[in-house]
Curated annotation (Swiss-Prot):
Protein name from the UniProt record: Protein translocase subunit SecA
Organism annotation: Aliivibrio salmonicida (strain LFI1238) (Vibrio salmonicida (strain LFI1238))
Enzyme class per UniProt: translocase
Gene symbol of the encoding locus: secA
Keywords (A to Z) from UniProt: ATP-binding, Cell inner membrane, Cell membrane, Cytoplasm, Membrane, Metal-binding, Nucleotide-binding, Protein transport, Translocase, Translocation, Transport, Zinc
PANTHER family, A to Z: CHLOROPLAST PROTEIN-TRANSPORTING ATPASE, SECA INNER MEMBRANE COMPONENT OF SEC PROTEIN SECRETION SYSTEM
Amino acid sequence: MFSKILTKVIGSRNDRTLRKLRKIVDQINKLEPQFESLQDEELKAKTIEFRSRLEQGESLDDLLPEAFATVREASKRLYGMRHFDVQMIGGMVLNDSQIAEMRTGEGKTLTATLPCYLNALTGKGVHVVTVNDYLAKRDAETNRELFEFLGMTVGINVPNMPPQEKKLAYQSDILYGTNNEFGFDYLRDNMAFRAEDRVQRERYFAVIDEVDSILIDEARTPLIISGPADDSSELYTRINILIPQLVKQDEEDSEDYRGEGHYTLDEKGKQTHLTENGQEFVEQLLKDEGLMEEEDTLYSPANISLLHHINAALRAHVLFEKDVDYIVKDDEVIIVDEHTGRTMPGRRWSEGLHQAVEAKEGVKIQNENQTLASITFQNFFRLYDKLSGMTGTADTEAFEFQSIYGLDTVVIPTNRPMTRNDMGDLVYMTEAEKFAAIIEDIKACSERGQPVLVGTVSIEKSELLSNALKTAKIKHNVLNAKFHEQEADIVANAGTSSAVTIATNMAGRGTDIVLGGNWQAEVAKLDNPSAEQVQTIKAAWKEAHDTVLTAGGLHIIGTERHESRRIDNQLRGRAGRQGDAGSSRFYLSMEDALMRIFASDRVSNMMKKLGMEEGEAIEHPWVTKAIENAQRKVEGRNFDIRKQLLEYDDVANDQRKVVYELRDELMNVDDISEMINHNRQDVLEGLFGQYIPPQSLEEMWDVEGLTTRLRTDFDLDLPIQEWLDSDNKLHEDNLREKIIESAFQVYKEKEESVGESVLRNFEKAVMLQTLDGLWKEHLAAMDHLRQGIHLRGYAQKNPKQEYKRESFELFEGLLDTLKLDVVSILSKVRVQQQEDVERMEEQRRKNAEEVARLQKLQHQNAENQLDDGHSSDQNHSPMVRDERKVGRNEVCPCGSGKKYKQCHGKI
């Protein structure tokens, strides 16, 4: 109560921020006459002046008013477009590393030019991040003339660019690209073998367009670069045949309950598991197929791979639906992005799921993949010194932006008041009744000349509605993942009189729907249009625009509520741009996924008690509130999942930083001999301690074991026993020093025989190759660890703490093994000449090229992350080892009670 009164008196945080920024806008506006009087050359020269002032110690904040005034004036001269005051505020919010919530049609693309120009003055480069290639190219081409007029270079970063082109693009002052491509470039750079093969430079300032889509919706989908693993396509096919024989278990309190089924299905959590009955049934099927021994069970260690295949196949059949989660095109399964409705060619689900779906659909099964590198968007974008974003809908997720990314959200006022009429939801009993009502609404709008945009949640629903419209003989366009090649054209005409457009989810987002059609798109179709032709097109558009306004503007129909209120708001936001008339309404049914899974039974019971007849709808604020409460629950659950994913990934991220920093260091220096010498000292001291324990009696010394180990692992044939026999004063410390000195001496002789530069190159090559191999295995071990860590909860242990502890032990083991392997290889190898190094370098490059050719860029399935005490599906990533590698300081698994390094670790 008190906080509400205080807010009324002093204003909200948002109000206070806007008041402060309006004062700076006033300063910029006062500069306008001065900048209008400048000649073009004088305006262009401002960039050189600003850069010079930065070098002399002025800050970007000092330059901001003049820099923004420069961009506004250039835009007026080139495009005839003057930045509104609210766009100036938006630009300042972005420059302050905050999120600007700007409604659809308020000119986010033009707003971004302001902070991009200002921050590009530093020479460090600015990245403008978009959700797809089309928007990256469009925005780059739209703003290229403006930036180049002011002396800035503009680049585009899209998939499949040659490395040299990509490297050149990263040198641009302002670079437009997709979130995926920036992330994958980072991973690829950290797999490069030479410094000159890397394309990125420092990550200074990023402006993310549709920031909610990238930092919220896609936060659960890690970017993964993977290479091919072993071929097991036949096994997927054989197991796929078994799955349709399984029966789902009904809820015990449901009318259909027929006893224990073979698997459970949790639609809310998007999980499925075999029941005990199902496990026994599957085991019998596998035995009948000859895939399992008679006395075996699914959970015996030898059958872990079979269990992995069964779980993947079960998920493919039960959780993943054709034309909703994926489409089949050209004998390939192509993922459909659940957030945008777009297809993602080249992307593959990990952990065998994609192969299981391919087997289900009867298309060619491609090889499984093994993770070579991965990172989440959360951790990638936190690498930037400055991060900001724009979207039409961020306020509902403001808490998440602040808690995970440290980004405040500022709601920017519209340039003109919003006049859209958002009508209440209509709820029907069945989907058929709902679709009938939607058809009637579309008919009525079409007859009065009002354009309609219908939002659906899946390709399947969009095609169902399209067929119903065809039956009703209503002309319409479909905008979904199957037809996004014509996307821009369909969106350009979606605002024309009586146009009916069906859009899957938010396909077409990023392109404004202009009432009366897009006259600029019409002009673009002409070759060298004359001023008269342009004028004629504009006049025709003005007439069409006024006709549509009279009919009520764009009408939005939502066919289902989404899990997130934000996505519903995005759909509504397509209407009412820049103060235009518009309206929106959602049509729901009790058969919709959200209503069925999350909305309480009260709504359904209320409708039944009212004795509603077929075709009748209920419209009441209580119903709308119940639905919004259901959405809040889902949003809260999804936030918890994303937060948890980040907590687990932060552990891997700390390790990733260490490994990538080590790689950087290796690639940036020519001589790593000091590092090698330090490692040799550590390794030999550790080895010595295993066989001759500190401060121990000579009777406890294993001289023979030490001699053998030095000979086999380090090619050192030392007469240690003879030394001891001939010198009674050769104690433990002296003996250790003598062995280490001998090792250094042998290596020095090797250096003299092959040449210093040859050996330096060879050391670097061996270190890089060994590090990459161990890191790949470590990622597989971490995946394996994370998938079973939730079981620690049953032992009254905190899974997160256990994960941190064990992953740290794994990482310590990696660093120890790296030292040991590198020193061992360098000690044993015989480098004859420079050609040996070059041959190794060439082989390594060929291997890298082969991996690059075959590697898949994946989005790991979002739903198979873990929470603390609840199992996700038992999906086992392709493993390098069958078991977790035993750490050198752990107890030996043989049962001796000794440390592994002092027992079987010696072997």
